[in-house]
Structures are given as C-alpha cells and as structure tokens.
Design a protein with these regions (language model features):
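Cytosolic regulatory regions of ion transport systems
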Residues: 1-182
Length: 182
C-alpha cells in the first residue's frame, strides 16, 4: 500500500517507520528542510521529502494521486485540515486519516474536510483513563465513522462466568453488529 504521511515529528516518524517495517511504500513529508535532512540521516531506509504538505505543488510532486492512504500527522490542526481537504478533494485519495491535536477542534474533522478517520491523542488518553476508572474491563480505544462505531478492548477477569471463559470466540453468540479484530 502506498502511504503519504505529512508531518515528520515524533508521531509521523513513528507511523512511517512502523509502516515501512510492514513493507508499505511510505513517503514522509516534512516542511522543515533541516529536520527533513536529519530524518534522512537517522533513518536511511525512509523516504523523506522536504516539502510543505499544505501546498498543492508539494503534494503533486509527492505523487499524491497514487497514494492509497494519506495521514495528516502534523502538530497543527489547521494544517491537518488543509492537508486532508487537498488529499481528498484535489487528489482523490481513497483514505485520509487525520491527527487531532486539540480535542476542542474535533467537531471540524469530518467528511466535509476530507477526513475519513480522525484520531485525537488527548481524547484517546482521556477516554482510556475514564473507561479504566469507570468500567475496569472495557476500554474504548477510539470512535470510528464519526461516532457510529467504536473500537473497544475487552478483558475478562479470571472471576468472569465460566460460560465466557471456557468458550472460543467463534462459539460465542455475538450480536450481528459486533466484529472481533485482533
């Protein structure tokens, strides 16, 4: 899969390295030329491009039309919205994933701005804390499809009813709306 990531900070770089390790074709765009050069030196196998991902010409030069996924992972919400909109509207990228830095801005990250999936690190951590405190064994990892679906982690305690502990997942009768992922 061809993935273009905008933002060479710690988040964007970590994602780029993980996806590269999984044999995806990854391009990492970083607007700070000096920092982009540093990334190239530190990670010689990583395709790093020194360019401003908010500029149409830079995205065109990075061949966004051939991207399967664009990840807007800069530290600036406004930049991430511009990148998402350009990726979806101007380059018809099938999947756009966007980082939300300030959870107060979450309402903006929707299909109108070209966002397919938004990830808010502050909201995710807050949710993990809230769920761990309130429920204990069910953790809401993230909302998907603009709140229509949730990715949750369920951990059964050793004191859970044997009917749950002694069955495989395929033997459990799960609601048709439930999907198990690993």
């Amino acid at each position: 899969m061809r993935v273009v990531i905008a933002g060479g900070g710690s988040v964007g770089t970590a994602i780029a390295l993980d996806l590269t390790d999984r044999n995806h074709d990854v391009t990492l765009m970083e607007q700070n030329t000096g920092f982009a050069e540093k990334l190239k030196t530190q990670h010689p196998g990583l395709n790093v491009v020194a360019a401003d991902a908010c500029e149409y010409a830079s995205l065109s030069a990075a061949d966004l039309r051939s991207a399967d996924v664009v990840i807007a992972a800069t530290g600036d919400d406004e930049d991430n919205l511009v990148i998402s909109w350009l990726a979806k509207q101007e380059f018809a990228v099938p999947r756009v994933i966007t980082r939300i830095n300030n959870s107060r801005n979450a309402w903006l990250f929707n299909e109108a701005w070209g966002v397919d999936v938004s990830v808010s690190t502050p909201a995710l951590i807050t949710s993990l804390v809230d769920e761990a405190v309130e429920v204990g064994s069910i953790i809401n990892l993230m909302d998907l499809a603009h709140g229509k679906m949730r990715l949750i982690e369920v951990t059964l305690a050793s004191t859970a009813p044997a009917v749950l502990l002694d069955q495989s997942l395929e033997d459990l009768r799960l609601d048709g709306a439930v999907r198990v992922v690993a």
